[in-house]
Design a protein with these regions (language model features):
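A detector of tandem-repeat and repeat-rich interaction/domain scaffolds
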Residues: 36-113
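Glycine-rich hexapeptide-repeat left-handed beta-helix
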Residues: 85, 94, 100-154, 158-159
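Low-complexity, compositionally biased segments
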Residues: 12, 19, 30, 45, ...
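Extended, small-residue-rich solenoid/repeat segments and analogous flexible loops
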Residues: 1-54, 60, 66
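Terminal amphipathic alpha-helical/low-complexity segments used for targeting or macromolecular assembly
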Residues: 1-29, 128-189
Length: 189
């Protein structure tokens, strides 16, 4: 069981020589407001409507409730999950296999999966597993995250054809690819 921290605990945490507030792994669901330049350990959990100052850093496997807001230049480790309606300032970076609820919004120049200046869209309840599939457009091109798969759009299409050729799953995945390209192109600046 993770230690549950309160706002009072947050006041006792130390800052390192560069001014970063060191926050250990734990349950932060009782806290709504966090200052700038916090560093959180892995597996931290946060409640709904949390607000984080700019330049916060989160380790892997952190989870965030609905409508949380993050300042610019925040960094997130792999496999973090975000509730619906969360908003991120510009230049935020997201690790691999992060998941996002509906209606999340992203500032300019955010990066997902290590891609440069990426934007994304998701199609839910698709494929044999009926899971969410993420499509990204970045300076490096188009990419797809579907379960354990992460690769280029063309690699994904090849994998879909080899795995689901001639089935409804191939048809729906390829339709989702076409939709993603059209929508991402319309949003690309």
């Amino acid at each position: 069981m993770m230690k549950k921290y309160t706002a009072k605990d947050l006041e006792t945490f130390q800052r390192d020589e560069q001014g970063w507030l060191i926050c250990p792994s734990g349950d932060y669901t009782a806290i709504r407001e966090f200052p700038e330049k916090c560093i959180f350990g892995n597996g931290c959990s946060f409640g709904r409507r949390c607000r984080f100052g700019k330049c916060s850093n989160f380790d892997v496997f952190c989870s965030f409730g609905e409508t949380s807001a993050f300042g610019k230049c925040s960094n997130f480790g792999d496999v973090c999950s975000f509730g619906e309606g969360s908003c991120f300032g510009g230049r935020c970076n997201f690790g691999k296999q992060c998941s996002f609820g509906e209606y999340c919004c992203f500032g300019h120049n955010c990066s997902h999966e290590g891609l440069t200046n990426s934007i994304y869209m998701a199609v839910d309840k698709i494929g044999i597993e009926l899971r969410k599939t993420y499509f990204f457009k970045a300076e490096e091109g188009y990419f797809v995250r579907a379960g354990c798969f992460f690769g280029t759009l063309n690699e994904f299409k090849t994998q879909v054809h080899e795995t689901h050729g001639g089935t409804i799953y191939e048809t729906t995945y390829l339709m989702a690819c076409d939709l993603a390209v059209k929508l991402l192109d319309s949003q690309w600046k």
